[in-house]
Structures are given as C-alpha cells and as structure tokens.
Amino acid sequence: MLTLTSYFGFLLAALTITSALFIGLSKIRLI
C-alpha cells in the first residue's frame, strides 16, 4: 500500500509540474 501511495503521489507531482511548465510556455508564446 505504501509503495502504491508513493507511486501515485509521484505521478501526481510529475503531472502537476508538467502542466505548470506547459502553461508557462504557453503564456510566454502568447506574449
């Protein structure tokens, strides 16, 4: 269970960071 929870936590963090970077690049392109 602990390994599964850690995996989902890492996956969620990676997804959040990727989304943040994508949004940042989109804003830079718009400017």
Curated annotation (Swiss-Prot):
<keyword id="KW-0793">Thylakoid</keyword>
<keyword id="KW-0602">Photosynthesis</keyword>
<keyword id="KW-0249">Electron transport</keyword>
<keyword id="KW-0812">Transmembrane</keyword>
<dbReference type="GO" id="GO:0009535">
    <property type="term" value="C:chloroplast thylakoid membrane"/>
</dbReference>
<dbReference type="InterPro" id="IPR007802">
    <property type="entry name" value="Cyt_b6/f_cplx_su6"/>
</dbReference>
<keyword id="KW-1133">Transmembrane helix</keyword>
<dbReference type="Pfam" id="PF05115">
    <property type="entry name" value="PetL"/>
</dbReference>
<comment type="subunit">
    <text>The 4 large subunits of the cytochrome b6-f complex are cytochrome b6, subunit IV (17 kDa polypeptide, PetD), cytochrome f and the Rieske protein, while the 4 small subunits are PetG, PetL, PetM and PetN. The complex functions as a dimer.</text>
</comment>
<protein>
    <recommendedName>
        <fullName>Cytochrome b6-f complex subunit 6</fullName>
    </recommendedName>
</protein>
<keyword id="KW-0934">Plastid</keyword>
<keyword id="KW-0150">Chloroplast</keyword>
<keyword id="KW-0813">Transport</keyword>
<feature type="transmembrane region" description="Helical">
    <location>
        <begin position="4"/>
        <end position="26"/>
    </location>
</feature>
<comment type="similarity">
    <text>Belongs to the PetL family.</text>
</comment>
<dbReference type="GO" id="GO:0015979">
    <property type="term" value="P:photosynthesis"/>
</dbReference>
<dbReference type="GO" id="GO:0009512">
    <property type="term" value="C:cytochrome b6f complex"/>
</dbReference>
<keyword id="KW-0472">Membrane</keyword>
<dbReference type="GO" id="GO:0045158">
    <property type="term" value="F:electron transporter, transferring electrons within cytochrome b6/f complex of photosystem II activity"/>
</dbReference>
<comment type="function">
    <text>Component of the cytochrome b6-f complex, which mediates electron transfer between photosystem II (PSII) and photosystem I (PSI), cyclic electron flow around PSI, and state transitions. PetL is important for photoautotrophic growth as well as for electron transfer efficiency and stability of the cytochrome b6-f complex.</text>
</comment>
